[in-house]
Design a protein with these regions (language model features):
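Acidic, Ser/Thr-rich peripheral helices and adjacent loops at domain boundaries
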Residues: 77, 105, 112-113, 217-229, ...
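Long, polar/charge-rich, low-hydrophobicity segments
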Residues: 176, 180-190, 213-224, 229-232, ...
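N-terminal [4Fe-4S]-dependent radical SAM core
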Residues: 1-9
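Local cysteine-cluster metal-coordination motifs and their immediate loop/turn environment
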Residues: 11-27
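Iron-sulfur (Fe-S) cluster-binding segments and ferredoxin-like electron-carrier domains
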Residues: 23-39
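Radical SAM enzyme core and accessory elements
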Residues: 227, 236-315
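Conserved SAM/AdoMet-binding glycine-rich loop
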Residues: 46-198
């Protein structure tokens, strides 16, 4: 896994007014603040000049919500495009999608466009307050496809509160519908490229200071069953790849993120055993995390799944 990416990064906006119910940064970084456009342009040019990076990222929780985003990218493109310096934006919000921005973002090369529906069914998107519809998703993908993009990446979260196999059915139907509509569009518009879709599934981790902080994490066996079910339902779809994050790491994250002082001895013991670079996959020692928890009488699975009552004291 990669914890740091090889590009110049400039923060353009802090906070987010969308308030998705699973998102911790959106709730703890308020109020919303935007950096002036002229400052962003100046900082980005200096950073690229001084570092030699050939890619830069304009970072925020929702970059296409930044009010001057098109103007900033147009100004930077004047200097950067001819030097083949490309722009990376975090996944674009589908309800804020516009083709002009998409073209500006990938004016150097049309590679992969990343979109984040987060949930595959309309019911579940409503639960998490991700206010986008299936029609919005279809419109964004097909517009990109028609205008030269051949690779789309989706971010989804599995194991969200109230998720069932019916929601997995809806996700499979959505992916199938996208591929079907793309085939129709290819024939209608004589498009000479295909459409490859990569779905990256992360496992829901309840975060403090969010409306879902009281919810327990779904049992990992059940989450794995949901993922297997989705893969089975979509195995016939050509050009679709489904990736998913390690479930054990998600469980540990769920334990630590809502943990209290009772975990101090656990963290100290792990540190003494050499577990301090475990954000990198090659250094993650799963057996040590589990053995240490057992030695201290800590049940990771139960802590991760714990459902807090509204009158229970939070750590």
């Amino acid at each position: 896994s990669t914890s740091v990416q090889d590009r110049a990064v400039v923060e353009i906006r802090r906070g987010c007014g969308r308030m998705c119910r699973f998102c911790q940064p959106g709730h703890v970084t308020l109020p919303l603040r935007e950096r002036p456009a002229e400052d962003i342009i100046k900082i980005t040019k200096e950073l690229v000049k001084n570092t030699g990076y050939d890619e830069y990222s304009l970072l925020s929780l929702s970059s296409n919500d930044y009010k001057n985003i098109n103007e900033v990218i147009k100004e930077l493109a004047v200097d950067f495009n001819e030097k083949k310096i490309s722009l990376s934006l975090p996944s674009q919000r589908i309800d804020g999608f516009n083709l002009e921005l998409a073209n500006l973002v990938q004016s150097v090369r049309k590679s992969t466009m990343t979109l984040a529906p987060e949930a595959g069914s309309q019911r579940l998107r409503n639960v998490i307050k991700k206010n986008i519809t299936e029609d919005m998703i279809l419109n964004a993908v097909l517009t990109l496809y028609e205008n030269g993009w051949s690779r789309i990446k989706f971010y989804f979260i599995c194991g969200l509160p109230t998720e069932t196999l019916e929601d997995m059915d809806e996700m499979a139907n959505l992916l199938n519908k996208i591929k079907y509509r793309a085939r129709l569009l290819k024939r209608e518009k004589s498009i000479n490229h295909g459409l490859d879709i990569t779905c990256t599934l992360s496992i829901f981790v309840p975060k403090p200071f969010t409306p879902f902080q009281w919810c327990g994490q779904m049992d990992l066996k059940e989450v794995s069953e949901h993922i297997r079910y989705l893969k089975e339902k979509t195995k016939h779809i050509k050009g679709l790849k489904i990736n998913y994050h390690e479930d054990v790491i998600s469980q540990i994250e769920a334990v630590l993120t809502r943990g209290n002082k009772s975990l101090c001895k656990y963290i100290e013991a792990l540190y003494k055993k050499g577990c301090y670079l475990d954000a990198w996959g090659e250094y993650f020692k799963e057996n040590i995390w589990h053995e240490t928890a057992k030695e201290l009488g800590i049940d990771l699975a139960e802590l991760a799944k714990h459902q807090y009552s509204t009158d229970e004291e939070l750590a």
